[in-house]
């Protein structure tokens, strides 16, 4: 069961002026499920994106990178069930055929379409079925289609992930709505996750590009479920410019800071929802590392802890075998780390317990305190490296028996 992840309701999601969303059952992999999503963007919309760093980059990601560079995106098309990764030249041809078909359906050029796929790797995309499903998705286009889209992009997810909020910018109300999917193969940069965030703010392309990268780094690039990096992950931010605010072009201005805070907030909530719905997860863990020389080494330590199977299984069992945390810190690759200056805490919203200091177990630590904290569903591991002022946070979950079962049964 997801960890404190509340099922989203249709009324929770706000339409974004300039964006219409439709879904359809295309039978990509399984019958009788909505697996095709079409998103139409108003003319003049600006789009930014960041994509997987996996060298085995999927065909749709390769095409997305080319098309987004053109600077005039009018549509997004997303299929679930088949990733169209590891499919060679045929995969690229299928992704291109998808863009051609979407362009014909919407009256735009193929180069104005961004394709996205998620699902099983090394299987050919049934492009004929996808294209046959486009008329139904087109007929379904509407401003309030976000709820259905959040469900249509799911794979092993157990709950849809979607967030809306509004913010005042330049005397205008700006609306943001985002959806994401992912539950396994989650580890930056990024993972088997798709994220789509739309707003109606008017913002320069340069600032939108920078903001998208920053938001991804602070959210989707700060989560891990199992340490595997996918071939298909993509995070897209759309700004339609229809809110009526003066275009935001000053990175130091209050308007940009308001938009920045809102985009990062929605991105973090979408990313955390992925971890809360991690395959087989029973605990949501925040790994907060401070006192580093720079953010890079803080993130190294946080990921070493958050990706350790031994740490994750200990948390599943509520077993305070906390030497596993110290071992993970030790192999994180931090040069000249003085373990005698380390301090480690376990915490919840109600309390924080000092576990280790001066290179060993804290004199005040009692195992029953560790057990009490680890029995909670939400736990923070705080580490002070004691060598600087930098800090970083990573979110992860535990490993349960169900993680193995879900992945063993994935293709069945």
UniProtKB/Swiss-Prot annotation:
Substrate binds at residues 155, 181, 192, 279, 407, 412. Its EC number is 2.3.1.35, 2.3.1.1. InterPro entries: Arg_biosynth_ArgJ, ArgJ-like_dom_sf, ArgJ_beta_C. It comes from the Bacteria. Pathway: Amino-acid biosynthesis; L-arginine biosynthesis; L-ornithine and N-acetyl-L-glutamate from L-glutamate and N(2)-acetyl-L-ornithine (cyclic): step 1/1; Amino-acid biosynthesis; L-arginine biosynthesis; N(2)-acetyl-L-ornithine from L-glutamate: step 1/4. NCBIfam families: ArgJ (TIGR00120), PRK05388.1 (NF003802). HAMAP family: ArgJ. PANTHER family: ARGININE BIOSYNTHESIS BIFUNCTIONAL PROTEIN ARGJ, ARGININE BIOSYNTHESIS BIFUNCTIONAL PROTEIN ARGJ, MITOCHONDRIAL. Belongs to the ArgJ family. This is Arginine biosynthesis bifunctional protein ArgJ. The lineage of its organism: Bacteria, Pseudomonadati, Pseudomonadota, Betaproteobacteria, Rhodocyclales. The gene is argJ.
């Amino acid at each position: 069961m997801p960890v404190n992840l509340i099922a989203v309701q249709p009324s929770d999601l706000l339409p974004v002026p300039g964006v219409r969303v439709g879904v359809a059952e295309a039978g990509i992999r399984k019958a009788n499920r909505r697996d095709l999503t079409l998103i139409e963007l108003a003319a003049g919309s600006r789009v930014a994106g960041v994509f997987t760093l996996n060298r085995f980059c999927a065909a749709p990601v390769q095409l997305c990178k080319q098309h987004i560079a053109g600077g005039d995106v009018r549509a997004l098309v997303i299929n679930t069930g088949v990733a169209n990764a590891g499919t060679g030249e045929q995969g690229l041809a299928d992704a291109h055929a998808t863009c051609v078909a979407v362009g014909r359906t919407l009256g735009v050029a193929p180069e104005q379409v961004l394709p996205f796929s998620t699902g099983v790797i090394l299987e050919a995309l049934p492009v004929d079925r996808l294209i046959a499903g486009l008329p139904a998705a087109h007929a379904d286009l509407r401003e309030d289609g976000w709820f259905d889209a959040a469900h249509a992009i799911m794979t092993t997810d157990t709950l849809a992930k979607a967030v809306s909020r509004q913010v005042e910018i330049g005397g205008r109300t700006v609306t943001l709505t985002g959806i994401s999917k992912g539950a396994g193969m989650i580890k930056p940069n990024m993972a088997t996750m798709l994220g789509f965030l739309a707003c109606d703010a008017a913002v320069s392309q340069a600032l939108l590009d920078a903001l998208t990268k920053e938001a991804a780094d602070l959210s989707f690039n700060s989560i891990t479920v199992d340490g595997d990096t996918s071939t298909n992950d993509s995070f897209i931010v759309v700004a339609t410019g229809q809110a009526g605010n003066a275009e935001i072009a000053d990175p130091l201005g209050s308007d940009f800071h308001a938009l920045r805070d809102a985009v990062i907030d929605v991105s973090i909530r979408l990313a955390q929802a992925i971890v809360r719905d991690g395959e087989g997860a029973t605990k949501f863990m925040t790994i907060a590392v401070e006192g580093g020389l720079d953010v890079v080494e803080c993130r190294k330590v946080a990921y070493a802890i958050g990706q350790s199977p031994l740490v994750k299984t200990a948390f599943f069992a509520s077993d305070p075998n906390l030497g596993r945390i110290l071992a993970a810190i030790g192999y994180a690759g931090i040069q000249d780390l003085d373990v005698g200056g380390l301090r480690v805490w376990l915490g919840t919203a109600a309390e924080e317990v000092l576990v280790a200091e001066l290179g060993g177990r804290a004199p005040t630590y009692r195992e029953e305190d560790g057990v009490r904290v680890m029995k909670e569903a939400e736990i923070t591991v705080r580490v002070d490296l004691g060598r600087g002022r930098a800090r970083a946070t990573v979110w992860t979950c535990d490993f349960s028996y169900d993680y193995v079962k879900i992945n063993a049964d994935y293709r069945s």
